[in-house]
Amino acid sequence: MFVFPASVLAQDSPDWLTKFPRREVHVSAWPGGKKVAVSFALFVEVFGFGQGPILRPDLASRNPDLVNESFRQYAISAGNPRLGRLFRELDVPLSVVLNAAFADAHPAVWKQFRDTQPKAPIIAHGINNSNDILPLGRGLTEQRAYIRRTLDLIAKSTGVRPTGWSSPSVYHNADTMQAIASEGLSYSLDQMDSDTISRLQTPSGVLTLLPYPTVTVDMGQFLARMKSPSEIESLWLDYVVELAREARANPVREATTVVIGLHPFVFGTPDGAASMRRVLSELKKDDTVWLTDTEAILKAAGVN
């Protein structure tokens, strides 16, 4: 008899954050018999002048802070299109996690990027990533209004109304999950504690939770742990290849999923893109790995 790992069994119980019922979605294999679904999700974000990620904390007190602002502007204007081109060139699906204010704030950049990725699923990511984020602690009604405004803005500026959600800075609460479901969204990237898909039964409907592991998010590794793109390249390959090895060692093991957070600040530079190219080229060689997008995962799992 095969015994599921404790981490899998733990999903068939109340969610530890929201206390809502949560159950694993059982997937024996992905299309083509593959066992590890990998979706790279590019975070296309807007911060505003003087706000956002800081590469050089020692210079952040300058006014204006030209060095760190240049770091951010380069990522937005050069990094996003470069990554769009790279994924198109290698014919690897890409998912897009979008701040609602981005397309209007940077219309030329958005057009240039979207021309390279016209069919990439768009996942809503709040209004911006600095001063217009989720109103946590202010009740369900205000969160619903914020999420609705986010969806309306994205639909107006891109022509696409998202069905997925990612909370800015992965900062949310139980009201967020209920509000997401209330506004007609079907899935979230806010699950950071598993290798398998699960379903969250909120009072307003069911949400599918796609695994978005903390350790694989490039921004945290880059800014908090001071890892270079080539070091993150090694981490990503180790992470996915080990999941594939586990699957080959135990063929009856549940198929796994990992959505990997990708930011233009880290991998949108020429050296970062070179690392990204090596990651994708290596993963394409593994017949256990399915490189795909978030919506294809939902469809294959039968939950879209």
Residue ranges and their predicted role:
Residues D12-P121, N129, T256, V279-L283, ...:
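Active-site beta->alpha N-cap acidic-glycine motif
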Residues H106-P107, A174-M177, P270-M276:
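Conserved strand-to-helix beginnings and helix N-cap segments that scaffold or border functional pockets
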Residues D12-G32, D152-K156, V160-R253:
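Active-site-adjacent pocket scaffolds in enzyme catalytic domains
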